Amino acid sequence: MWNSGFESFSSSSYGAAGGYTQSPGGFGSPTPSQAEKKSRARAQHIVPCTISQLLSATLTDEVFKIGDVEISQVTIVGIIRHAEKAPTNIVYKIDDMTAAPMDVRQWVDTDDTSGENTVVPPETYVKVAGHLRSFQNKKSLVAFKIIPLEDMNEFTAHILEVVNSHLMLSKANSQASVGRPSMSNPGMGEPGNFSGNNFMPANGLTVVQNQVLNLIKACPRPEGLNFQDLRSQLQHMPVASIKQAVDFLCNEGHIYSTVDDDHFKSTDAE
């Protein structure tokens, strides 16, 4: 899948560098000097994220952080909802169903004839690597690589990478902080932090629950979204997981059934 462009978040690569490292032919950045490596190590690595995490990231002294994890270069996986090409760039709206779609800008090399400037069509699932940016309090990504998914298992694998990478980076950051008290309950963390055993976005729902809820919210039909339509849009996800998420959201009052037991609408819908 993406192994050619990434080194995994293994103990060996993590212990040496703190995360994903540059490998030939893949997503990477120019090798920094030794001094830069020491002062900016974590920020130089490509960190798997969800859009929900990126939108909740804080910006202090030109440094983005998710909890205590410093980020700069990130990857996301989602579906293209809209694509618009201009003479110098292509702007995509990418939706991973954990939050509102995020703008992703890819600059166009007008002298390049290799096909890199081809617009990826809407409704295509892609993996994006890029730099997080903020302009007038609106976050976006400047992409240096956008590749369509060949296998929907890559979507699931990305979510697992998100959990794993932030757990490891949070742990390393905690160990590096001199005199920092250890957490009395390692299964719980501050909002936006990733020290817990279960990855939970800011609203307290799991990734699966957020994806299901956002799809139901986005459905404009008066009768709401049909369960079969939900399944077709979440092909990467087991049916049992979708059903569990729907049941949970119903029980918690986030959604309700409408014309029958297979149509659902968000309680936040207008």
From Swiss-Prot:
Post-translational modification: Differentially phosphorylated throughout the cell cycle, becoming phosphorylated at the G1-S transition and dephosphorylated in late mitosis. Mainly phosphorylated at Ser-23 and Ser-29, by cyclin A-CDK2 and cyclin B-CDK1, respectively during DNA replication and mitosis. Dephosphorylation may require the serine/threonine-protein phosphatase 4. Phosphorylation at Ser-23 and Ser-29 is a prerequisite for further phosphorylation. Becomes hyperphosphorylated on additional residues including Ser-4, Ser-8, Thr-21 and Ser-33 in response to DNA damage. DNA damage-induced 'Lys-63'-linked polyubiquitination by PRPF19 mediates ATRIP recruitment to the RPA complex at sites of DNA damage and activation of ATR. Ubiquitinated by RFWD3 at stalled replication forks in response to DNA damage: ubiquitination by RFWD3 does not lead to degradation by the proteasome and promotes removal of the RPA complex from stalled replication forks, promoting homologous recombination.
Lineage: Eukaryota, Metazoa, Chordata, Craniata, Vertebrata
Region annotation (Disordered) ranges: 22-41
Domain of life: Eukaryota
Protein name as catalogued: Replication protein A 32 kDa subunit
UniProt function note: As part of the heterotrimeric replication protein A complex (RPA/RP-A), binds and stabilizes single-stranded DNA intermediates, that form during DNA replication or upon DNA stress. It prevents their reannealing and in parallel, recruits and activates different proteins and complexes involved in DNA metabolism. Thereby, it plays an essential role both in DNA replication and the cellular response to DNA damage. In the cellular response to DNA damage, the RPA complex controls DNA repair and DNA damage checkpoint activation.
Signal sequence extent: none
Membrane-traversing stretches: none
Subunit structure: Component of the replication protein A complex (RPA/RP-A), a heterotrimeric complex composed of RPA1, RPA2 and RPA3. Interacts with PRPF19; the PRP19-CDC5L complex is recruited to the sites of DNA repair where it ubiquitinates the replication protein A complex (RPA). Interacts with SERTAD3. Interacts with TIPIN. Interacts with TIMELESS. Interacts with PPP4R2; the interaction is direct, DNA damage-dependent and mediates the recruitment of the PP4 catalytic subunit PPP4C. Interacts (hyperphosphorylated) with RAD51.
Modification Phosphothreonine occurs at: 21
Region described as Interaction with RAD52, TIPIN, UNG and XPA: 187-270
One Pfam family named in its UniProt record: RPA_C
GO MF, one annotated term: single-stranded DNA binding
